[in-house]
Regions:
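STAS-typified acidic loop motif
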Residues: 2-28, 48-49
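Amphipathic alpha-helical interaction surfaces in cytosolic regulatory modules
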Residues: 22-93
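Short acidic-hydrophobic, aromatic-tinged amphipathic segments that line or gate anion-handling sites
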Residues: 95-97
Length: 97
């Protein structure tokens, strides 16, 4: 898994590629910063797989942003990843575009 960070005007974008699984999810969690942010974006264009560990990281990041009064968006998930979000009900919780 590769992660690229971009911070601009209170908006942190994490561009992730590869698989978010049990081995890589802790690393992604370590990259999530919510303090002082108004928006957190996960660009999942090049993510091919998300396990339950990855879902946990995304859900916790969402909760932190809501508590901080900000918003979180997931952008460009591949069809297989979007299907995981649909099957788990995450499409009802998270903003996915």
């Amino acid at each position: 898994m590769e992660i690229t960070k971009s911070l601009e005007s209170g908006k942190l974008t994490l561009t992730v590629s590869g698989e978010i699984d049990t081995l890589t999810a802790p690393r992604l969690d370590g990259e999530v910063e919510t303090e002082g942010l108004s928006e957190l974006v996960f660009d999942l264009t090049d993510v091919t797989y998300v396990s339950s560990a990855g879902l946990r990281v995304l859900l916790l990041a969402h909760k932190k942003m809501v508590q901080a009064g900000g918003k979180m968006t997931i952008t460009h998930p591949q069809e297989a990843v979007r299907r995981v979000f649909t099957l788990t009900g995450f499409v009802k919780i998270l903003t996915i575009v």
